[in-house]
């Protein structure tokens, strides 16, 4: 998403984003054509492990999803995790499996089922795509993701209503969804709080990794 890219970008780091799979593939391929030494899937994720709170940072060892099992680069992953030592992220960082999905996973039941079947700590819609491209090009691949919505929380429909295919958001569809079902407001406000915590973790992780 756009806010994730704004956090990630900086000297020596080109950040690309999109919400639709084909647009993600195109954006990554265009970035690779300009030259890069590897790919890091950096951003937010939905929690699957029931003990992980919003703001937990995950450095993935493997990504399981629609494209199979994709291993991350052990050296890059270790360097990312080790960079957190002595920083605010150190107490909130874990290593383990990530899951990839083709559509948003918003329900508590669906999250629980995916956790039971994969053992993944968290889930996103981009890491498996980035990993497959990295593997095809022979490039190092790593994942750094911060949990927004924990495993025990379902997302209201309004949470995804404003997401555009290009990864940006617009407010009007969210407002329309709230007008249709005002009872979603409480859950949306809780999600906003979780998102602030995750964003703080991402900013701290970015500073720890790249300075």
Which positions does each model-derived feature cover?
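Glycine-rich phosphate- or other oxyanion-binding loops that anchor nucleotides, phosphorylated ligands
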Residues: 1-211
């Amino acid at each position: 998403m756009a806010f994730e890219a704004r956090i990630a970008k900086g000297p020596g780091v080109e950040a690309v984003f999109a919400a639709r799979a084909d647009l993600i593939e195109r954006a990554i391929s265009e970035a690779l054509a300009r030259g890069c030494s590897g790919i890091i899937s950096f951003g937010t994720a939905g929690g699957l492990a029931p003990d992980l709170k919003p703001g937990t940072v995950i450095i993935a060892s493997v990504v399981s999803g629609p494209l199979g099992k994709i291993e991350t680069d052990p050296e890059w992953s270790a360097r990312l995790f080790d960079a957190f030592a002595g920083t605010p992220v150190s107490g909130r960082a874990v290593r383990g499996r990530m899951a990839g999905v083709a559509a948003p996973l918003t329900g508590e039941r669906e999250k629980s089922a995916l956790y039971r079947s994969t053992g993944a700590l968290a889930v996103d819609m981009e890491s498996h795509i980035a990993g497959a491209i990295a593997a095809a090009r022979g490039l190092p691949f790593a994942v750094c993701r911060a949990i927004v919505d924990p495993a025990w929380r379902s997302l209201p429909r309004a949470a995804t209503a404003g997401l555009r295919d290009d990864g940006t958001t617009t407010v009007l569809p969210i407002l329309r969804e709230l007008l249709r079902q005002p009872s979603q407001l409480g859950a949306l406000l809780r999600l906003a709080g979780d998102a602030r915590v995750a964003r703080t973790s991402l900013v701290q992780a970015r500073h720890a990794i790249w300075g």
